[in-house]
A protein has these predicted regions:
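N-terminal non-catalytic cap/leader segment that marks the start of a structured domain
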Residues: 1-95, 262-264
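Catalytic-pocket segment enriched in acidic/His residues
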Residues: 5, 9-10, 47, 53-56, ...
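Residue-level recognition of short, solvent-exposed, well-ordered loop/turn junctions
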Residues: 68, 122-124, 233, 258-259
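Structural signature of FAD isoalloxazine-binding scaffolds in flavoprotein oxidoreductases
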Residues: 90-108, 123, 257-269
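A structural-propensity feature for long, helix-poor, extended segments
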Residues: 107-128
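N-terminal accessory regions of nucleic-acid-interacting proteins
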Residues: 136-150
Length: 282
């Protein structure tokens, strides 16, 4: 299933994408899409619904974050070997974990705000893993049983903030730095998350092109690893790192986002995002 939320910010309704790509209204069936709805029981109930029985949503409404109740926004750094190389950093021997503040979460096509002091604003197309059941000290073999589905994430990053110290969070957590969606695609449709093509264009020019097969640590490894250090709860999301092609890595001169730039990004089977960079308005 492809689950989503649509409508004005703060007034989103739950939706479902049918096999023809049409947006269907779920609001007469469920009030919202959150941890209960993406639990195994919740997804089983939703799977019984025939999309053709739901009203078609007219027009092209704004797409919101595809679900609510994100308690933790966990991120993995340098998880593609070529990206580590372009960043001038050693390939990690174990996953690098950091956090993005949940206040940075943004709709998939909403504007990205350039902070007033920003000088090195950058992009990162990533695969997001959405947790569906509590995971604590799980094995790699069982890890994906705790996953509800997958999303597109843009791990927007201010490199000047990020590299001021060994802690990356402040370069990753500004408001609007966490676009998620447009859909939460359940594991019945994404049976193997390690074969997904991914891309990011800047103003129509291809900057990133990769595939999740080149992750250093795959999705099962990441869920199992993170669960050794914190309990993962339904609704938590792990964003899994980015392939090469970020602005910081462009040679000979890095390229950073400026006001007016447009990012278009996506992953195979998970939909696309599009964001315009805008100035901070106070």
């Amino acid at each position: 299933m492809k689950l989503c939320r649509y409508g004005k910010d703060g007034f989103e309704k739950p939706g479902m994408i049918d096999s023809d790509g049409k947006l269907r209204d779920l609001s007469k069936v469920i009030g919202n899409i959150g941890p209960a709805e993406i639990s195994p029981r919740g997804l089983k109930n939703l799977a019984r619904i025939k999309p053709g029985s739901l009203p078609v949503v007219a027009g092209n409404p704004r797409m919101g974050v595809p679900y609510v109740g994100i308690g933790k926004f966990v991120a993995i750094g340098l998880n593609y070997s070529d990206h580590a190389k372009e960043a001038g950093m050693a390939i990690p021997s174990e996953p690098i974990i950091f956090s993005k503040a949940t206040t940075c979460i943004n709709g998939p096509d909403d504007d990205v705000i350039k902070p007033p002091a920003s000088t090195k604003l950058d992009w990162e197309v990533e695969l997001g893993i959405v947790i569906g059941t509590k995971a604590r000290h799980v094995t790699k073999e069982k890890a994906l049983e705790h996953v509800a589905g997958y999303c597109v994430v843009n791990d927007v990053s201010e490199r000047a903030f990020q590299l001021q110290s060994s802690q990356w969070d402040k370069g990753k957590s500004y408001d609007t730095f966490g676009p998620i969606g447009p859909w939460l695609v359940t594991t019945d449709e994404i049976t193997d998350p390690q074969v997904l093509d991914m891309f990011l264009d800047l103003n129509g020019k291809r900057m990133q092109s990769g595939n999740t097969r080149t992750m250093i640590f795959d999705c099962a490894h990441l869920v199992a690893y993170v669960s050794q250090y914190m309990t993962l709860l339904p609704g938590d999301i792990i964003t899994t790192g980015t392939p090469p092609g970020v602005g910081m890595g462009v040679k000979p001169d890095p390229v950073f986002l400026k006001v007016g730039d447009v990012m278009t990004l996506g992953l195979q089977g998970l939909g696309q995002q599009k964001q315009k960079v805008v100035a901070y308005q106070g």
